[in-house]
Amino acid sequence: MKSKQEIVPNVTIAIPVYNVERYVEKALLSALEQDFQLPYEILVIDDCGNDNSMEIVRKLQSEHPQGNIIRIIRHERNKGLGEARNTSIREARGKYLLFLDSDDWLNKEALSILYKAAIEHDAEITIGSTLKVYEGSDKTETFVYPETFISKPSAGIELNVFRGITPLVSYWNKLFLLDFIKKSDMYCVHRIMEDVIPDFKAKVLSHKVVTIPDITLYYNERGGSIMDTLWVNDTKCQQTIDTTVDIIKRIKRMIQEDYYNIDGIYDIYFANLMRYFFLYEQLGVTQEQYPQVMEIEQNCMSFIPSLRYIHGRNARIMYLLLHRREHDRSDFFKAYRFASSRLGRMLKLLISL
């Protein structure tokens, strides 16, 4: 008879830890106190911070009644969230893998809800709904998805482009079949915006995707998080620009080499472009940084063969507005600002009537 330690877990919850002593206890307790009745493990990735985060983890490991399901993997040096995700993929023992960031927390029934849906549909990706909590205020925001099951090639594109269900670009709050992640080579390649390339591959390569309306994750929107510090100084701004340029190059190359004939692929590409144009607006890109930004601007619209390759009505309008101005740098950003403005949204509404 196998001992408890030898039992293969059904699910691995992976939690990266780096300088989160204010938050990690709540995150870890939410993982420890799941009502899930099958074996699962909690994999903590110690990314070599300099606060008391890991002391809190080790205390829970030794004192909590469920503490023996915690397993700690320590990096030899700080490697960033992307590599912490990769370590989780390599080290996970569960059939399914759920990422939990160390400043968020799970609904007590999250594993039960996600696992049940995954098993019922033999899904590669099972996506729960999210409640975003704004730290220090009563403000909340919900991201609730209808109950949906898609079984077809590139199921993630079908979900996003043709069903209009657009889960957040993230690894968290999604229960993944671990074999699917490995076979699809969904490893992170960047320190920031690390989930974008794996998310792109997930959309393209998935065959069975489930979304459920139940809130399974509480996402903590806090000051000082990685996303909030992307543009705090010139160095961070430059790092962000470098990363976005590389992401777009990688996505273009994957489309050109392997995915050019997939219906809806250019919608996914275009959505990423729009995300980065918005980011550049937030960054306040300087004249010195424009040459790199132009690597995305230059010919970015012409990479899309024609308007008929874009399916969403709003995306088609944005494409038309930007395509006419792509060779004029100043007009290009003016067009983006206009298309994103309230006036632009009003025009979209009028056109849709």
Predicted feature locations:
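Donor-binding/catalytic cores of nucleotide-activated saccharide
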Residues: 102-212, 219-236
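A conserved acidic beta->alpha catalytic loop
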Residues: 30, 46-56, 77
